[in-house]
């Protein structure tokens, strides 16, 4: 009986620790996942191939520190594309990982992969000032021009 009680107490303590830390687990230097219940500025991002390049339209954004953005993503291209928010350094590092595993799909709050002609949404709150990156990290796409800049002021 004592063993059962101690095991249950350990389980409850562990779960309460998980619940306690949940709110900040995705905080990054470029922000955190947005709250879909809160207002957000809508920014439409189109992904496509054009004249031998792969591009985002627009490829430069200005955001206020603390602002929440609802990215409405549309892949108008003929191949899969993704939208990954991060620092340039993080995205370049992850791009190298993607070269080793090109079929890697993301299930992260800062990334969304879309099939051709598909749409999707990503909500992100930019909590710190700085210059950040968004990229398509599918092998060959970023070097073909598929990246952009987010300036948070």
Language model features with spans:
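Extracellular/periplasmic metallocenter environments
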Residues: 22, 108-153
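N-terminal edge beta-strand
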Residues: 36-68
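Bacterial N-terminal signal peptides that target proteins for export
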Residues: 1-6
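Beta-strand cores of secreted/periplasmic/IMS beta-sandwich domains, seen most often
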Residues: 58-84, 120-128, 152
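Short aromatic-acidic-glycine turn motif
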Residues: 89-100
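Bacterial N-terminal signal peptides
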Residues: 7-16
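Short beta-strand and strand-turn-strand segments in soluble, beta-rich domains
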Residues: 53, 99-108
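Cleaved targeting-peptide boundary
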Residues: 15-28
